[in-house]
């Protein structure tokens, strides 16, 4: 009897939270924006970037020859005016993320709500993608989700640099399901990050049955200028009801480029200087149209103005 009541209350809580989220989004009417700290590969940088004003961070995952994620690291070259050499062992980094996204933990950071796992799978053969997904899921389940017991609450994006590595998604999804926690996949989204043609990206998702939870990235290092034509194409596909739910751009560090990206309709801006986006969001032309996303904003729901 007590178990039955607990299950009812648990389900009510989940549906109630979703209803509150929908009401909040309708009530505000501004597009939620994810301020995405770029290349956060050291544990100490997590706190640094949150203190600088991000609600999301991106980090680079390197694999060994067997497709096992080993450490966070970008290496040379990287963005201009940044240190390229910070790194941590993957398990230790995930544990640090869990502490900072678990309510009640002494290290908890309420505003940190989304991660981007920039997976450097180009070092792998195409036929290793599935196993890489299995290995990613195994480590994330253990170190971040605490084996399914009160793990971190953040959403995250598996960002893949190669369209031929779509089976990574399948390996990840099947592993979490086999561990008896398919509900955790509600926290997981996807991105192909190599600036491929949008129709080709959609075909890759189709091969593994992905129809939602999709963020589409576009960008280049801050050392080089890049136009917004592909961003606008992705935004158009998003707004037409296609597989894309959100669009983000990287790496944007200038005030003018930040304004241009917001004008183009992006949902997220990846940056080395979070204060730039935060300052722009306070400007008269933007403060009534955009706001910083919170945990109550579902990152897999396409915003409707």
UniProtKB/Swiss-Prot annotation:
It catalyses: an N-(acyl)-sphingosylphosphocholine = an N-(acyl)-sphingosyl-1,3-cyclic phosphate + choline; an N-(acyl)-sphingosylphosphoethanolamine = an N-(acyl)-sphingosyl-1,3-cyclic phosphate + ethanolamine; a 1-acyl-sn-glycero-3-phosphocholine = a 1-acyl-sn-glycero-2,3-cyclic phosphate + choline; a 1-acyl-sn-glycero-3-phosphoethanolamine = a 1-acyl-sn-glycero-2,3-cyclic phosphate + ethanolamine. Keywords: Cytolysis, Dermonecrotic toxin, Disulfide bond, Hemolysis, Lipid degradation, Lipid metabolism, Lyase, Magnesium, Metal-binding, Secreted, Signal, Toxin, Zymogen. Pfam families: GDPD_2. It is an enzyme of class 4 (lyase). Its EC number is 4.6.1.-. GO terms for cellular component: extracellular region. The keyword Secreted applies. Disulfide bonds join 78-84, 80-223. Binds 1 Mg(2+) ion per subunit. Residues 19-26 form a propeptide. The active site is at residues 38, 74. Its main location: secreted. Its cofactor is Mg(2+). It is found in: Secreted. Residues 1-18 form the signal peptide. Mg(2+) binds at residues 58, 60, 118. GO terms for biological process: killing of cells of another organism; lipid catabolic process; phospholipid metabolic process; venom-mediated edema in another organism; venom-mediated platelet aggregation. Dermonecrotic toxins cleave the phosphodiester linkage between the phosphate and headgroup of certain phospholipids (sphingolipid and lysolipid substrates), forming an alcohol (often choline) and a cyclic phosphate. This toxin acts on sphingomyelin (SM) wih high activity. It may also act on ceramide phosphoethanolamine (CPE), lysophosphatidylcholine (LPC) and lysophosphatidylethanolamine (LPE), but not on lysophosphatidylserine (LPS), and lysophosphatidylglycerol (LPG). It acts by transphosphatidylation, releasing exclusively cyclic phosphate products as second products. This is Dermonecrotic toxin LiSicTox-alphaII1. It comes from Loxosceles intermedia.
């Amino acid at each position: 009897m007590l178990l039955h009541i607990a299950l009812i209350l648990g389900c009510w809580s989940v549906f109630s939270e979703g209803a509150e989220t929908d009401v909040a989004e309708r009530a505000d009417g501004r597009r939620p924006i994810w301020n995405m700290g770029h290349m956060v590969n050291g544990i100490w940088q997590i706190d640094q970037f949150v203190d600088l004003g991000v609600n999301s961070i991106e980090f680079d995952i390197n694999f060994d020859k067997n497709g096992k994620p080993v450490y966070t690291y970008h290496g040379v070259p990287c963005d201009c005016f940044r240190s390229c050499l910070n790194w941590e062992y993957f398990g230790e980094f995930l544990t640090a993320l869990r502490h900072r996204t678990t309510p009640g933990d002494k290290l908890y950071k309420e505003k940190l709500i989304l991660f981007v796992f920039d997976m450097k799978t180009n070092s792998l053969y195409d036929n290793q993608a599935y196993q890489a997904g299995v290995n990613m899921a195994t480590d994330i389940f253990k170190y971040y989700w605490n084996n399914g017991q009160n793990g971190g609450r953040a959403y995250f994006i598996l960002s893949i640099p190669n369209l031929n590595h779509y089976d990574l998604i399948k390996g990840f999804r099947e592993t979490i399901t086999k561990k008896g926690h398919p509900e955790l996949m509600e926290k997981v989204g996807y991105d192909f990050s190599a600036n491929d043609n949008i129709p080709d990206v959609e075909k890759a998702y189709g091969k593994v049955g992905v129809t939602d939870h999709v963020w589409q990235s576009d960008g280049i290092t801050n050392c080089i200028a890049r136009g917004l034509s592909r961003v606008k194409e992705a935004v158009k596909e998003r707004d037409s009801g296609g597989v894309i739910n959100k669009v983000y751009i990287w790496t944007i560090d200038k005030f003018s480029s930040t304004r241009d990206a917001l004008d183009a309709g992006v949902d997220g801006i990846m940056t080395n200087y979070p204060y730039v986006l935060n300052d722009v969001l306070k400007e008269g032309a933007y403060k009534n149209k955009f706001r910083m996303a919170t945990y109550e904003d579902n990152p897999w729901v396409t915003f409707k103005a």
